[in-house]
Amino acid sequence: LHSTSRRQRQMCIRDRDLLILVEEMRKVATNLYVTTDDGTYGFHGMGTNQLQELWDKGVRYDHCVAIGPMIMMKFVCKLTKELGIPTVVSMNPIMVDGTGMCGACRLMVGGEVKFACVDGPEFDGHQVDFDQAMKRQLQYKTEEGRAMLKLQEGDTHHGGCGQCGGEA
């Protein structure tokens, strides 16, 4: 980052406890803008709100890299598309085999099927069909929930109700 030039940087995170590399980013950024959803550090609000506010004040970006929850990346891409800022996203759908054979990480990007495990995980954010990707994520929620119950309940977990403690 430093060798290309000193530029504007924006970090957006849920809360202060999740912030990493702030001092390292300050060393390579002319200006570092930090946004936390809960206001525990820096700008209070959503990263898109701060980005729009900075844009309105004349701060310009030549590109954006968005990494995080799909819903956040969707709205970052919606805004950056309106502002004409090229945007790369790092997609993180569930990946099962890492070869593309299972299809678990299938995405639509620019109207074409792509697999995050072999074609990505970085893609042009303005080309990703986030609505479809988020719907596909939901298909694993039941299994994720059962796995979480098993982790929390240990040997007393027998099938998903989370209450019986008996045999399935």
Feature locations, PLM:
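Single conserved hydrophobic/aromatic residue that forms the stacking wall/gate
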Residues: 1-9, 13
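Reductase modules of NAD(P)H-dependent flavoproteins
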Residues: 16-168
